[in-house]
Amino acid sequence: MATIIQAKDLRAGHTFLYKGSIYQVIENSFNKTAMREGIVKCKVKNLRTGAITVEVLTGEKVEQAIIEKSKMTFSYDDGSGYVFMDNETYEQISIPYNQLSWEKNFIEEGTEVSVMRYDGELMGVSLPDQLVVTIVEAEEAVQGNSVQNATKRAWLASKWEFQVPQFIKSGEKVIINPSNGQYVGRAK
């Protein structure tokens, strides 16, 4: 039996069915005004297409989508998608590029992810809260720039550009938050 949820109860990470599609909540906001129904705005990712949109779900009820997750490791790019290997059965699957539009920026060989399925249909991957990645290129530190929180640009192999502290060099491993792509700290 399907579980029905009030839209105002949706939180980041929840998955639900809406207008024939399966969505995962990235972030949400609920604004309650006097004598009116609250306005629920959710930034959501369509798990079938990878598209990220904002849905206004004021007063709506949605059906919860139960997503099965299995741990897999990224192996290689086969030219049409990314190949992942199941950590227990060693089964390999290829996930098309369009299903990993955001996640592809942070996946390196050996990255462990959770592959998501709904009723056997492949929905994409879920990354851990923090990932260790390798800086392939970093700008030179500016001599004398000792202002608090001085940063410079750095790039991953995927060409993802983000800000890192001045002391980070090319080839170093750092920790990033894949939900926003920002630097968290040095990897140990």
Curated annotation (Swiss-Prot):
The keyword Cytoplasm applies. InterPro entries: Elong-fact-P_C (IPR015365), NA-bd_OB-fold (IPR012340), Rib_uL2_dom2 (IPR014722), Transl_elong_fac_P/YeiP (IPR020599), Transl_elong_KOW-like (IPR013185), Transl_elong_P/YeiP_cen (IPR001059), Transl_elongation_fac_P (IPR011768), Translation_prot_SH3-like_sf (IPR008991). The keyword Protein biosynthesis applies. It comes from the Bacteria. One of its GO terms (biological process) is peptide biosynthetic process. Pathway: Protein biosynthesis; polypeptide chain elongation. It is found in: Cytoplasm. Keywords: Cytoplasm, Elongation factor, Protein biosynthesis. One of its GO terms (molecular function) is translation elongation factor activity. GO terms for cellular component: cytoplasm. SMART domains: EFP, Elong-fact-P_C. Belongs to the elongation factor P family. NCBIfam families: efp (TIGR00038), PRK00529.1 (NF001810). HAMAP family: EF_P. Involved in peptide bond synthesis. Stimulates efficient translation and peptide-bond synthesis on native or reconstituted 70S ribosomes in vitro. Probably functions indirectly by altering the affinity of the ribosome for aminoacyl-tRNA, thus increasing their reactivity as acceptors for peptidyl transferase. This is Elongation factor P.
